[in-house]
Design a protein with these regions (language model features):
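Small-residue-rich transmembrane alpha-helices and their cytosolic helix-loop interfaces
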Residues: 14, 46, 50, 77, ...
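Residue-level signature of mid-helix packing/kink "hotspots" within the transmembrane helices
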Residues: 22, 50-58, 141-142
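Paired small-residue
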Residues: 83, 94-102
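Cytoplasmic helix-loop-helix junction between adjacent transmembrane helices
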Residues: 99-136
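Helix-breaking motifs and short loop linkers at transmembrane-helix boundaries and internal kinks
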Residues: 36, 68, 89-94, 123
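Conserved MFS/SLC helix-loop-helix module at the cytosolic interface between two early adjacent transmembrane helices
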Residues: 55-91
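Membrane-interface helix caps of multi-pass secondary transporters
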Residues: 24-36
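Conserved extracellular-gate-facing transmembrane-helix segments in secondary transporters
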Residues: 16-24
Length: 144
């Protein structure tokens, strides 16, 4: 049986986690305009956010499969949002790179545990639950 209330709650968490991931492409032009960075420099931020977080995500997937750590979802949302929010306080490249990396790792922490929870909450309606979860993430990315 679909536990609709909690599926929507996890989808809201997905929304807030993915706001940070959607914000990064939107702020790249500001780094170029105000900090004098070039396109290859800001491409490094996308590398930090996407590629580096993808490298560690399987580790958190393994952890989600072997231990139930639902608090990892909260940690992931917190890291993702706070680190991306702190980006605006720094002007030097490597500080921003580090914060973007931490934000991406927050996203990598959130997604496997959240996917595990969605599967558990879905009952026989896995497609419906996953769709609701996905709408949350896509909405967050769009708002970001």
């Amino acid at each position: 049986m679909l536990n609709q209330k909690y599926v929507y709650l996890v989808a809201v968490g997905h929304f807030f986690c993915d706001i940070a991931m959607g914000a990064l492409p939107a702020i790249l032009p500001f780094f170029i305009l105000y900090y004098g960075m070039d396109y290859s420099a800001v491409a490094g931020f996308m590398f930090a956010s996407s590629f580096l977080s993808s490298l560690v995500q399987p580790t958190f997937g393994w952890l989600a499969d072997h231990t139930s750590k639902t608090w990892l979802m909260s940690l992931g949302i917190l890291l993702s949002g706070v680190a991306m929010g702190l980006v605006g306080l720094f002007e030097d490249y490597w500080s921003i790179f580090a914060l973007v990396t931490v934000s991406g790792i927050g996203s990598a922490i959130f997604h496997p545990e959240a996917a595990r929870i969605i599967n558990k909450l879905s009952g026989a309606k896995r497609g419906t639950a996953l769709s609701i979860f996905s709408v949350g993430g896509n909405g967050g990315f769009a708002v970001g």
